From Swiss-Prot:
<keyword id="KW-0238">DNA-binding</keyword>
<keyword id="KW-0539">Nucleus</keyword>
<keyword id="KW-0378">Hydrolase</keyword>
<keyword id="KW-0547">Nucleotide-binding</keyword>
<dbReference type="Pfam" id="PF00270">
    <property type="entry name" value="DEAD"/>
</dbReference>
<dbReference type="GO" id="GO:0045003">
    <property type="term" value="P:double-strand break repair via synthesis-dependent strand annealing"/>
</dbReference>
<dbReference type="InterPro" id="IPR014001">
    <property type="entry name" value="Helicase_ATP-bd"/>
</dbReference>
<dbReference type="GO" id="GO:0090734">
    <property type="term" value="C:site of DNA damage"/>
</dbReference>
<dbReference type="Pfam" id="PF21099">
    <property type="entry name" value="POLQ_helical"/>
</dbReference>
<feature type="domain" description="Helicase ATP-binding">
    <location>
        <begin position="346"/>
        <end position="518"/>
    </location>
</feature>
<dbReference type="GO" id="GO:0000724">
    <property type="term" value="P:double-strand break repair via homologous recombination"/>
</dbReference>
<dbReference type="InterPro" id="IPR050474">
    <property type="entry name" value="Hel308_SKI2-like"/>
</dbReference>
<keyword id="KW-0067">ATP-binding</keyword>
<comment type="similarity">
    <text>Belongs to the helicase family. SKI2 subfamily.</text>
</comment>
<feature type="short sequence motif" description="DEAH box">
    <location>
        <begin position="463"/>
        <end position="466"/>
    </location>
</feature>
<dbReference type="InterPro" id="IPR001650">
    <property type="entry name" value="Helicase_C-like"/>
</dbReference>
<keyword id="KW-0347">Helicase</keyword>
């Protein structure tokens, strides 16, 4: 190889020599070799000519382009004489200026194929002529294995590329020599310096093969030329046959492989020409070389651009097949429904248009959204925001998608409650899926707009889109979507819901297409129960229902008094083998119904999964530090439990897990379960057509009955609405009328709606004058519906009035930009207080009160305890719901330390005032009721942080534990808002560090050692205690845990839950590691405005 390499290097510098034509290789026979009377010569030449003509019509083989010199005279790259017979096949009607791009020149030009071209035909003719010589027929079949592989021939051959031909030649002094066996030709020292590098390597292969003919095994050799890599070649079998032992065996071999041996010559030449095509050809023009290099780079860049812009990564809706496998592995989904396939292949989806789709509950809407999100994350390489209505659903979705993030390489980030970073971490490699509540989603979008990163958000998915018409939360959702539509032309919006009616308004607002289907994986049958008769809902019937059956359950007089609605009869038809939900009007009614049903169930129900139900009770006691709700203690042994907001988060999660696994078979619940986590049932019973004291709405009814029927488990779903005769007409209207229309609440929710919107528009500089703000409002959902919603005032008047209010409140200032006799135009800019309010997402009704409280707190902030800080972060909107127990208030007040009593004194609440209220005495001095009530709630929170036992605090203050849980969650969220509020005001610098720690304490409200475990989504206090006791004391422990070991170690932990916990821990660990790594790289990166960098670039220029 070294020798070959040196020859290749030599040939570049040595002068080129003239070489003879093709015939000299196999040489026409000399005078001594010719046989007189060879009459077939002319006929054979005609046959060869016909063979050359037959090659027309075969498509040329695609090969790598050959670089040519600047002038047509340089077509012969190797130098030397050109055979005119070969050049006549080359195109000559093209001038220099008409030449195609060099990168597209086919080295074989007009020839149809290098497997059967005229050059090969010439070689074939010469071989046939040689074989027809009588004295050479004996050795004809030996030609390929002996002469072609001999050292002398190897050294005599050289290959010259001529335009799009390849000519095989010999030196002039061997022109009249023939390739007889036994004739020795002494090789010259420099016979290969004109051979291209790949050919030199090729003949080196031949030499080595001929030396190894006696070996019994075949050898493969990989060669690399000095200029490029060549493909691994395996030498033809004909060149490495074993030596012939005797004449007989030799004869047999020759006879059986005549055709193979003849073809081997072609094979050798084909390989040689292919190698020559890949060999780097010397370039004599430096400008031409530079041009070709630039062209090659442009082609490579274009290829990479095409590859990177391709959104098709695989066969599963442009996603890798691994995604399909993960759905089968994690969720048991083997195949999509027909409607899901249709929806995913809609033109509007393919063209990235906005889309609204609506299907009944349990129809599989979420799966379509997830596939679209994965397409955006993996194919389009952009971030995704998913907006969900409740914290519990956010956490459920985080747990479900973390496994996909680990496997497919993207982050899943939680934005709910007090969790979420603003602005979000900017990832350079992996993309992020933000899963957020409505409020946190709005803050996230504001943050992205402010930092100029809104276009990094490729897709926004909104679940339960109908909530856009529900109060202040609907107004917040509308603001979020309107800002995205106005500021980003590349962000796609997907909205889904089971209950939509006036879709046209939403389509106009979102500029979206609409897709709907009535598909349900399980058939749903609706029934009405009046007295002991059950009717089936039938839209074709005259009165909307038809008789179905009579209840045949035997009721005693006692049972009839206790259960006038026949609930026991209805549930015992289903449980315990199937699940059942009973929706009740109020929380108290849920508990009463659960206890009543258990009183009349037979003892046989106690035996059904008895061991598992004992485990549930045991775990509930562990969660409550030995405390257990007496109602649950009586109902769980029968497989029955209540489900409402009075449960703590840990209790609710544990009961939901038990229901999902079939340990519990009956839930008595409020309407909030219908819109919360997915807990379907075989039968759904509506205890009454009321939610609290309000009559049921069509949307609420559809959501409740939509829980009936579990895909993959039940073959049918049933809903039964129990009603009294007096409600019959209203119920018939309820089941037949269309869904309620969805209306904007942007103006109705004044301080949480339109004013908050205007403040953020000006603060984010989306619109800063009256005309721009009015134009923005016309594009909102309210703008679409203004003709219906506005009766007394116009949109312009409302806009002017709102801006005036914000200016008077000190949140905005206006600057005159144009003034004339007829009109004055203003530009608005946000004040420091206004910026703090919109950055902290503070309700504008309370922003000035909050500012005053924080300002007053600076005058005498008491830091000996957390009580003063807790008071400052207790939500204002919960104060009006508080009705203190004055005796408890007085008892707690009297137990305060002097420093804590000092906090009350600073706030203006004295012990004497509380004592008089407790004893019922008249109060002479007027005290602010809101301050008194807020301090009472602060006592509750302060006690909870000290004791961390919600049951103990519940007993001390005589409050439902669920209320205390909600108070804690709301305070943690508001504390986060106050922190962002203070970050915008320099005067409140002291609160920043203090509120960070307080927010963390309020969020977890556990001992410090449990906080790292509770950072993992789905791990609440009870589970954190179990994990800590089992030795899992850090995030790293959980991230590296084995799910199977967790199942065996932790009580009442399913395999699915264990996998989700481990996946969530891994995701959180990766996020933290990635953030630290990016921070390090950012610190080490040279600043773009570094003076030395500018000087360096100037010097290079």
């Amino acid at each position: 190889m070294d020798e070959c390499g040196s020859r290749i290097r030599r040939r570049v510098s040595l002068p080129k020599r003239n070489r003879p034509s093709l015939g000299c290789i196999f040489g026409a026979p000399t005078a001594a070799e010719l046989v007189p009377g060879d009459e077939g010569k002319e006929e054979e030449e005609m046959v060869a000519e016909n063979r050359r003509r037959k090659t027309a019509g075969v498509l040329p083989v695609e090969v790598q382009p050959l670089l040519l010199s600047d002038s047509p005279e340089c077509l012969v790259l190797g130098g030397g004489d050109t055979n005119p017979d070969l050049l006549r096949h080359m195109p000559t009607d093209r001038g220099v200026g008409d030449q195609p791009n060099d990168s597209e020149v086919d080295m074989f030009g007009d020839y149809d194929s290098f497997t059967e071209n005229s050059f090969i035909a010439q070689v074939d003719d010469l071989e046939q002529k040689y074989m027809q010589l009588p004295e050479h027929k004996k050795h004809a079949t030996d030609f390929a294995t002996e002469n072609l592989c001999s050292e002398s021939i190897k050294n005599k051959l050289s290959i010259t590329t001529i335009g799009n031909l390849t000519e095989l030649q010999t030196d002039k002094h061997t022109e009249n020599q023939s390739g007889y066996e036994g004739v020795t030709i002494e090789p010259g020292a420099d016979l290969l310096y004109d051979v291209p590098s790949s050919q030199a390597i090729y003949f080196e292969n031949l030499q080595n093969s001929s030396n190894d003919l006696g070996d019994h095994s075949m050898k493969e050799r990989d060669w690399k030329s000095s200029s490029h890599n060549t493909v691994n070649e395996e030498l033809p079998h004909n060149c490495i046959e074993q030596p012939q032992q005797n004449d007989e065996s030799s004869s047999k071999v020759r006879t059986s492989s005549d055709m193979n041996r003849r073809k081997s010559i072609k094979d050798h030449l084909k390989n040689a020409m292919t190698g020559n095509a890949k060999a780097q050809t010397p370039i004599f023009s430096r400008s031409k070389q530079l041009k070709d290099t630039l062209l090659s780079e442009e082609i490579n860049v274009a290829k990479k651009t095409v590859e990177s812009s391709s959104n098709d990564l695989g066969p599963f809706y442009s996603l890798p097949s691994k995604v399909r496998d993960l759905y089968a592995q994690f969720k048991g989904i083997e195949k999509l429904y027909e409607w899901q396939h249709t929806c995913l292949t809609l033109n509007s989806v393919q063209e990235r248009k906005n889309l609204i789709y609506s299907l009944p509950t349990s129809g599989g809407k979420t799966l379509v959204a997830e596939i679209l999100m994965l397409q955006e994350l993996l194919c389009c390489r952009k971030d995704v925001l998913m907006i969900l209505p409740y914290v519990a659903i956010v956490q459920e979705k985080i747990s479900g998608l973390s496994s996909f993030g680990i496997e497919l390489g993207f982050f899943v980030e939680e934005y709910a409650g007090s969790k979420g970073r603003f602005p979000p971490t900017k990832r350079r490699e992996k993309k992020s899926l933000y899963i957020a509540t409505i409020e946190k989603g709005h803050s996230l979008v504001n943050s992205l707009i402010e930092t100029g990163r809104i276009d990094s958000l490729g897709l926004v998915v909104v679940d339960e889109l109908h909530m856009i018409g529900e109060g202040s939360r609907g107004a917040t959702l509308e603001m979020t979507l309107a800002k995205i539509l106005y500021t980003s032309k590349t962000t796609q919006i997907i909205g889904m819901s089971a209950t939509l009616n006036n879709v046209e308004d939403l389509q106009k607002f979102l500029q979206a297409e609409y897709y709907t289907s009535q598909f349900r994986p399980v058939e749903l049958k609706e029934y009405l129960k009046i007295n002991d008769t059950i009717y089936e809902v039938d839209s074709k019937a005259e009165n909307g229902m038809t008789f179905s059956r009579l209840l045949n359950y035997k009721y005693s007089d006692t049972l009839k008094k206790m259960d006038p609605d026949h609930l026991v009869a209805l549930v015992t038809e289903v449980i315990p083998n199937y699940s059942c939900l009973v929706f009740c009007p109020s929380k108290k009614n849920c508990e009463n119904v659960a206890e009543m049903i258990c009183k009349f169930l037979s003892k046989e129900y106690l035996k059904h999964k008895e061991k598992e139900k004992c485990e549930v009770i045991k775990n509930l006691k562990n969660i409550g530090n030995g405390n257990l709700c007496p109602v649950l203690k009586r109902t769980i042994p029968f497989g029955v439990a209540y489900h409402h907001s009075g449960l703590t988060s840990d209790e609710r999660k544990l009961l939901e897990e038990a229901y999902s696994t079939g340990v519990l078979c009956l839930f008595t619940c409020t309407s909030t379960l219908a819109a919360g986590v997915n807990l379907p049932a075989r039968r759904v019973i509506l205890r009454a057509p009321y939610v609290a004291k309000e009559f049921l709405k069509r949307n609420q009814y559809k959501q409740m009955i939509g829980r009936a029927g579990r895909a993959g488990i039940d073959t049918i779903g049933e809903s039964i609405l129990i009603l009294q005769e007096k409600d019959k007409q209203q119920v018939l209207e309820l089941i037949t009328k269309p869904l309620e229309n969805c209306y904007s609440h942007l103006v109705q929710e004044f301080t949480k709606g339109i004013q908050t919107l205007f403040l953020s528009l000006i603060g984010l500089k989306i619109a800063t004058n009256l005309d721009d703000i009015y134009h923005f409002m016309n594009g909102t959902f309210f703008g679409v519906q203004q003709k219906v919603l506005l009766k007394e005032k116009s949109l312009w008047e409302i806009t002017v009035e709102s801006l005036r209010y914000l200016t008077e409140k000190g949140l905005l200032q206006k600057d005159t930009i144009y003034k004339s006799e007829e009109e004055v135009q203003y530009n608005f800019h946000i004040t420091k207080l206004g910026r703090a309010s919109f950055k902290g997402t503070i309700d504008l009704a309370y922003c000035d009160i909050l500012y005053r409280d924080l300002k007053k707190g600076l005058e005498g902030l008491v830091l000996e305890s957390l009580l003063h800080l807790i008071y400052l972060t207790t939500p204002y909107d919960l104060v009006s719901q508080c009705n203190p127990d004055w005796m408890i208030y007085f008892r707690q007040f009297s137990q305060l330390s002097p420093a804590e009593q000092n906090v009350a004194a600073i706030l203006g609440v004295s012990e004497s005032f509380i004592g008089k209220k407790a004893s019922g005495q008249a109060i002479g001095k007027k005290v602010d009721k809101n301050v008194v009530n807020r301090l009472y709630l602060s006592f509750v929170l302060y006690t909870l942080l000290k004791e961390t036992n919600i049951w103990t605090v519940s007993e001390k203050f005589n409050m439902p534990r669920g209320y205390i849980q909600n108070l804690l969650t709301g305070t943690a969220s508001f504390s986060s808002c106050v922190l962002h509020f203070c970050e915008e005001l320099e005067e409140f610098w002291v609160y920043r560090a203090l509120l960070v720690e307080l927010t963390k304490k309020l969020t977890y409200c556990v001992k410090a050692e449990l906080i790292p475990l509770m950072e993992v989504t789905g791990v609440l206090e009870g589970r954190a205690k179990q994990l800590y006791s089992a030795g899992y004391k850090s995030l790293m422990h959980l991230a590296n845990a084995n799910p199977e070991v967790l199942v065996r170690t932790i009580d009442h932990l399913s395999r699915r839950q264990a996998k989700q916990i481990v996946s969530s821990a891994k995701m959180l660990l990766h996020e933290k590691a990635e953030a630290l790594q990016e921070e390090v790289e950012e610190l080490l990166r040279l600043p773009s405005d570094f003076p030395g960098a500018v000087a360096s670039s100037t010097d290079k220029a």
